[in-house]
Amino acid sequence: MTESQGTVTFKDVAIDFTQEEWKRLDPAQRKLYRNVMLENYNNLITVGYPFTKPDVIFKLEQEEEPWVMEEEVLRRHWQGEIWGVDEHQKNQDRLLRQVEVKFQKTLTEEKGNECQKKFANVFPLNSDFFPSRHNLYEYDLFGKCLEHNFDCHNNVKCLMRKEHCEYNEPVKSYGNSSSHFVITPFKCNHCGKGFNQTLDLIRHLRIHTGEKPYECSNCRKAFSHKEKLIKHYKIHSREQSYKCNECGKAFIKMSNLIRHQRIHTGEKPYACKECEKSFSQKSNLIDHEKIHTGEKPYECNECGKAFSQKQSLIAHQKVHTGEKPYACNECGKAFPRIASLALHMRSHTGEKPYKCDKCGKAFSQFSMLIIHVRIHTGEKPYECNECGKAFSQSSALTVHMRSHTGEKPYECKECRKAFSHKKNFITHQKIHTREKPYECNECGKAFIQMSNLVRHQRIHTGEKPYICKECGKAFSQKSNLIAHEKIHSGEKPYECNECGKAFSQKQNFITHQKVHTGEKPYDCNECGKAFSQIASLTLHLRSHTGEKPYECDKCGKAFSQCSLLNLHMRSHTGEKPYVCNECGKAFSQRTSLIVHMRGHTGEKPYECNKCGKAFSQSSSLTIHIRGHTGEKPFDCSKCGKAFSQISSLTLHMRKHTGEKPYHCIECGKAFSQKSHLVRHQRIHTH
């Protein structure tokens, strides 16, 4: 049969099997066939032959059975469908040979018919396996095609021989065959890695040289391998042909779908030999193993920081360059890594694919699910070497370590104040910008932090989720519960070095120290009065604004402070939680109990500088001093009369209003003063 001089196609080097023939191949023979066919296809692609990917290659890539109908095999080879070799092919042959000489990898010269003979070592040409004449011709044709189109040693088939090549490479048995063949005759001079083809070696060398000859025409991204460029193009074309049956998510590659499905099945086939921790992806296992070895082969040239993963180094380098090539189409925010963009996109879509099988809570990131699950398991794998305290998150341990080292890496550019926590730094910056993005729907009050708004809203709802196990008392804030529990334990870990006074709360201790230093850093812009605490300034400002955000739901009376509302509520409930140990008398306020106790002890800590008279209450001393100074700060708006005490003004005002709030239960007579009622009631008792 004469050879036609036409363009070489993939069919020159292709072998077809019928279903019956394919079944007779053992696993080793099938594997070899797959490798050879894919290799020949890649060789033609590499030297620039343009053609559509054949069906058989699709099948081999998807690991499907590549056999064809017997009629198709007959038609191809008995209808003269044979291709010759043109000048272009001969030039490519010469080019390949030059490349091999360049790398000084010379194998023993073998003829095409010898290749056919070696190939028969794995595919024995017996009457059982090759019942028809066209099959014999197929293998004969294959040998000739190799002889014409590729150097014999450029094909895996021709490497199967019992004798060694001149490099004395190690050999191994393949399948059940007693034949041996060379695996990697072409060595990389940089890292020593071996390859069975020169073209594979050429592609590998691009890792060392950084060469990326394949560029995307859409985004100019370059790749070292043509296959990677083809896969990349699918991102632009949105071609996602592999869909998950569980959640409907689609993928460009079948391998990505297989990895994704492990999220649903929970399969983790890759286990660490050191600690037996298992992973759903092999790459994650490889990264994990570096924790045990301590290996960090990837070092940053800018700052010297080392990483166990190459991808982590690449991501880190963008910190120095400021490069953020991945932009969100929704809001324009840019990211240094495509993975970060993918996670960010879920904030727009609301996608939360990772669900907790304990409580049903869903998360947008797998790492967040892992952290959440530790709430259920109680696992705290990150332990402090200094104090032994354990944490469920690595970031929490990092922040905790700063309490030992004193490190405060976050510094405010406005006031130079430094913080150990990033979130505290961000919150602090809002003081300078006066930004209060979180507003209460009930009263319109705005807050710097979301957590402050949540706590504030409990005033309106009355929610008190934190309950004391000792006495059952409930609190709206966890910090208040912790402080309260110290009353039961008697713990006062914070002691003043000046006077020895101890406190159960750190904040109270800090406030107390300002008594000794006299520090009052918080000034009122209205009247200039200074305060030692910002909370005290906030409360004081309400005296200027008249703001009373805390309203009693029983009588509608409003208060400027939550604590005042709580005290007022006891007038409705009759609650008197503070009991005197001496006489059993109960009080609604703690301060009232303290003042009462002085009646038993005789303590009078407040002394007048003018006359030396002492008082059990600070307010009594204040009123007494006005007797010396003549100060009368409380004026009647009706007649202008002034009083030294507000209680005296209140009584006086009843003369103008006619108010008589004190009623006799015996006769119903009313009085403007309580003392008058008491005097009147004696009439009924005598």
UniProtKB/Swiss-Prot annotation:
PROSITE patterns hit by this protein: KRAB, ZINC_FINGER_C2H2_1, ZINC_FINGER_C2H2_2
Protein name: Zinc finger protein 569
Pfam families, per database record: KRAB, zf-C2H2
Zinc finger feature spans (C2H2-type): 186-208, 214-236, 242-264, 270-292, 298-320, 326-348, 354-376, 382-404, 410-432, 438-460, 466-488, 494-516, 522-544, 550-572, 578-600, 606-628, 634-656, 662-684
Cell compartments where the protein resides: Nucleus
Family: Belongs to the krueppel C2H2-type zinc-finger protein family.
Any single GO CC term annotated in Swiss-Prot or TrEMBL for this entry: nucleus
Keywords, alphabetical: DNA-binding, Metal-binding, Nucleus, Repeat, Transcription, Transcription regulation, Zinc, Zinc-finger
Gene designation per UniProt: ZNF569
GO BP term (any one): regulation of transcription by RNA polymerase II
Organism: Homo sapiens (Human)
Any GO molecular function: RNA polymerase II cis-regulatory region sequence-specific DNA binding
Chief localisation class: nucleus
Residue ranges of domain KRAB in the record: 8-79
Record function comment: May be involved in transcriptional regulation.
Statement: the UniProt record of this protein carries the keyword Cytoplasm: no
Xref: SMART domains: KRAB, ZnF_C2H2
